[in-house]
C-alpha cells in the first residue's frame, strides 16, 4: 500500500532548536527518511520555515508505518493517509493511451 505522510512540528519542539540543523537530534529525528525492512520511503520533501515535511511511502500495513514514524509523532502532528496509484490503475484498465 502507498501512504502519503505529512509531518510537522513547531519551533518549540524542533530537533534543531539547540545545535542547529547539524545537531545529533536532527539526524536522529530524520532517520525515518531512510525507511526500514518493512517500509520503503519513495520520496520526502520539506519546507523548513513552517517545519513541515511530506513523504510518499510504501508498506504492507499501517502498523509498520506507525512504528517507523513514532519519533515524528512524538514531536508534532503527523498525518498518514493511504492513497491509490491512479496512473497504475488507469494502465491496468487499458485506458493509458501513450
Locations of the language-model features?
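Short S/T/G/P-rich N-terminal loop/turn motif that feeds into the first structured element of a domain
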Residues: 1-51, 62, 85-98
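Short amphipathic alpha-helices in soluble, non-transmembrane regions
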Residues: 65-73
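Conserved short beta-strand edge segments in small beta-sheet-based binding/regulatory domains
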Residues: 75-87
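Short cationic amphipathic helices and targeting signals
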Residues: 52-57
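Helix N-cap motif at beta-to-alpha junctions
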Residues: 58-64
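Structural motif
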Residues: 37, 73-76
Amino acid at each position: 500500500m502507498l501512504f502519503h505522510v505529512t509531518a510537522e512540528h513547531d519551533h518549540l519542539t524542533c530537533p534543531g532548536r539547540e545545535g542547529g540543523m547539524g545537531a545529533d537530534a536532527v539526524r536522529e529525528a530524520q532517520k525515518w527518511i531512510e525507511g526500514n525492512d518493512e517500509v520503503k520511503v519513495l520520496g520526502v520533501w520539506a519546507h523548513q520555515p513552517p517545519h513541515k515535511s511530506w513523504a510518499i511511502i510504501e508498506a504492507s500495513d499501517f502498523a509498520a508505518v506507525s512504528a517507523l514514524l513514532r519519533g515524528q509523532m512524538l514531536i508534532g502532528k503527523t498525518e498518514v493517509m493511504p492513497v491509490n496509484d491512479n496512473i497504475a490503475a488507469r494502465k491496468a484498465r487499458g485506458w493509458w493511451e501513450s
